[in-house]
Amino acid sequence: MTALPATSIAAPSLDDLDALNAHLETLRADERVAWALQHGPQQAALSSSFGAQSAVTLHLLTQQRPDIPVILIDTGYLFPETYRFADALTERLSLNLQVYRPLVSRAWMEARHGRLWEQGMVGIDQYNNLRKVEPMRRALDELNVGTWFTGLRRSQSGGRAQTPIVQKRGDRYKISPIADWTDRDVWQYLQAHALPYHPLWEQGYVSIGDFHTTRRWEPGMREEDTRFFGLKRECGIHEDI
């Protein structure tokens, strides 16, 4: 692997980021991870929804940094299968799991606002901010994360089609080492390392979030149609942070 000097990422200009992304596009995912762990600002952390294909990035990162903090946002509305999946992968991969939760319980939120996810786009956005965006922002701040790894892939939705491998968000670098992977790439990696899909994958769930805003994929649907009643794909974490 050809590594760029550390100063290339310490204070990059937009031109530097363009050149850096062009360079990283030529590397394998594991080489991108190695580069970012070496040259990115500390602390590094990985966020994971423990969704359909999350085992890939969890394995990819922990092969190189076993104790990397893994941030899970527990909205209080995850599928029971997701909690069990998180437990299983945490045990298998010896994850340094850091669970963050909203400041307000689900019961108190519903007492104040009702079922926000049933109140159109305005309600969904408010719900996502309360239960996902705020806890993630707090996690990144409290853990002093300088290099944030994600499992975003361009093929997941139209809104993610231009996802760069590295981008700067505020004072933080966001790294998506499998941004260019296809579903087949994911399948091959899982097979090669005997890693599981989420338990709901076999039931037709291709994108898995909260139980009340996730539905099975059906013929003719896009992956993004399975979330938030087809109104939107993103929960806000990768838009607002």
Swiss-Prot record:
**UniProt GO cellular component terms:** cytoplasm
Where is this protein found? Cytoplasm
Q: Does the keyword Membrane apply?
A: no
According to its UniProt record, in which pathway does this protein act?
Sulfur metabolism; hydrogen sulfide biosynthesis; sulfite from sulfate: step 3/3
Q: Which GO terms describe its molecular function?
A: phosphoadenylyl-sulfate reductase (thioredoxin) activity
**InterPro entries attached here?**
PAPS/APS_Rdtase, PAPS_reduct_dom, PAPS_reductase_CysH, Rossmann-like_a/b/a_fold
Indicate the enzyme's highest-level EC class.
oxidoreductase
Which residues are responsible for catalysis?
A: C235
What keywords would UniProt list here?
Cytoplasm, Oxidoreductase
Task: List the catalysed reactions.
Answer: [thioredoxin]-disulfide + sulfite + adenosine 3',5'-bisphosphate + 2 H(+) = [thioredoxin]-dithiol + 3'-phosphoadenylyl sulfate
Q: What is its EC number?
A: 1.8.4.8
BP GO annotations: hydrogen sulfide biosynthetic process; sulfate assimilation, phosphoadenylyl sulfate reduction by phosphoadenylyl-sulfate reductase (thioredoxin)
UniProt keyword Cytoplasm present: yes
Its biological purpose is as follows: Catalyzes the formation of sulfite from phosphoadenosine 5'-phosphosulfate (PAPS) using thioredoxin as an electron donor.
Family as reported in the entry's similarity comment:
Belongs to the PAPS reductase family. CysH subfamily.
- HAMAP family recorded for this chain? CysH (MF_00063)
The name on file for this protein is Phosphoadenosine 5'-phosphosulfate reductase
> Which organism does this sequence originate in?
Xanthomonas campestris pv. campestris (strain ATCC 33913 / DSM 3586 / NCPPB 528 / LMG 568 / P 25)
